[in-house]
Amino acid sequence: MPAIALVGAQWGDEGKGKATDLVGDRVDYVVRYQGGNNAGHTVVIGDQEYALHLLPSGILTPGVIPVIANGVVIDPAVLFEELDALTARGVDVSRLLISANAHLIMPYHRALDKVSERFLGKGRIGTTGRGIGPTYADKTARAGVRVQDMFDPKILRKKLELALNDKNQILTKVYNRRALEVDRILDEYLGYAEKIRPYVVDTSLVLNRALDEGKTVFLEGSQGTLLDIDHGTYPFVTSSSPTAGGACSGSGIGPTRITKVIGILKAYTTRVGSGPFPTELEDEWGEWLRSRGHEYGTTTGRNRRCGWFDAPIARYATRINGITDFFLTKLDVLSGLERIPVCVAYDIDGVRHDEIPMTQTEFHHATPIYEYLDGWNEDISQARSFDDLPKNAQAYVRAIEEMSGAPISAIGVGPGREQTLELRPLV
């Protein structure tokens, strides 16, 4: 059976948790393959809302095996906080599997992330301050601490001593902060070791064997394509690869095993943090979208920047990921608009660009070129088929589909599990 990748097609917060929840009972494994607790998934089941930051959304579906794979960076304190919270609400968390090769977020990563962002002032990137970037930096520099290192106190102490020789110099001499102690961190993480041990396996081996046995593996990305370290709006990006390519390296599954790539698109556009955003609305319409769509970060609580749908970005995501199907979310938010602007291209210094420009300088100066589609007044939150939608809502979906370069196979018309129109099977 296939592996299926789920990717955000914008700047994150597109509704990936809703998509995972929709297909959760049709798959056998749900895998987080990158990022950490710097992103949030919100899943609504009946009258219960669950906000997950690190755990795969599939942990909420009985019988599904949730996996935190090698490409994820783990803050053990956050991990056990989420596990304990779900256990208290009656969720079985014993099925969770964690890669021995996943890297750990250490106290010095969080400390450096926070002070360096403040030090940058107006040049800040907009990090969540949770240590994600410094952890990936150490991973790339071959100086990171992995889950498996917690099981050998000698190796863990040696790695901590080497790390703090460097990190404490930066904390004390550059940022005038207090030095961190090896023994205190060692004791804390050795305590985590015994709690995490029952979950730790070779996740790549488990997932590939599952595929060999005909099981379905669902690879759940966090953030979005435009936040990818290689393909995003650099440097205003995350430190990992939330694209379909990242799903392979972050899970240990080969590219030929992924047979479908589902891109999640919001019916408008949002972004958290700094960086270019051509369709951003800094007026009453931006506040209208924010209020209607409840656009506040699951992880940070920060206001999301809001704007109209950006077709060049959607086409870019299709190209970068090889998207085969789109899931369009939050269509219901647009109800009540007489006309809906859609960005179809950019004007840069008087020249039309139908695709995302090559340089960030050009992207910063891009002005959206809009086409206007007729809106609708009806409440569509009770729609249960495409034919239930008003004609203008149907036309909006078809226009977005044509502009984005891949079929829209599902539509979200509200936050609930049942508020989804599946035009063709996603799994």
UniProtKB/Swiss-Prot annotation:
One of its GO terms (biological process) is IMP metabolic process. GTP binds at residues 12-18, 40-42, 304, 330-332, 412-414. Substrate binds at T298, T299, T300, G301, R302, N303, R304. Its cofactor is Mg(2+). It is found in: Cytoplasm. PROSITE patterns: ADENYLOSUCCIN_SYN_1, ADENYLOSUCCIN_SYN_2. Keywords: Cytoplasm, GTP-binding, Ligase, Magnesium, Metal-binding, Nucleotide-binding, Purine biosynthesis. GO terms for molecular function: adenylosuccinate synthase activity; GTP binding; magnesium ion binding. Binds 1 Mg(2+) ion per subunit. Pathway: Purine metabolism; AMP biosynthesis via de novo pathway; AMP from IMP: step 1/2. Homodimer. Plays an important role in the de novo pathway of purine nucleotide biosynthesis. Catalyzes the first committed step in the biosynthesis of AMP from IMP. This is Adenylosuccinate synthetase. The lineage of its organism: Bacteria, Bacillati, Actinomycetota, Actinomycetes, Streptosporangiales.
